[in-house]
């Protein structure tokens, strides 16, 4: 049960970080974005805690990035053992690994937004070279 719940948590928080990054990159008011999420069907205790952390770039640890990455690896190993595909988990695991490479191991797992930002910078550099 714990692995299934953590699969959802890890994937959801990576997606939430990406959504905040997308909203910010598109010039949206992030407080309006937070309000839209928290006043609709997507609202949860988790969004009410993590969106303000993302907006404020508060990476004080509640759940460490290193623990999130370890969790994704344990889940992936079990999924492979039982023959279950986990494409969302695999993508979020890659992002948490990239976040670790940015020295975010003891930062909150929402610091994964920095890995997403790094991908944006890399994509921009490739586009600029063309």
What are these regions (language model features)?
Residues 120-130:
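Hydrophobic alpha-helical segments
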Residues 1-120:
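Helical "substrate-binding/catalytic lid" subdomain
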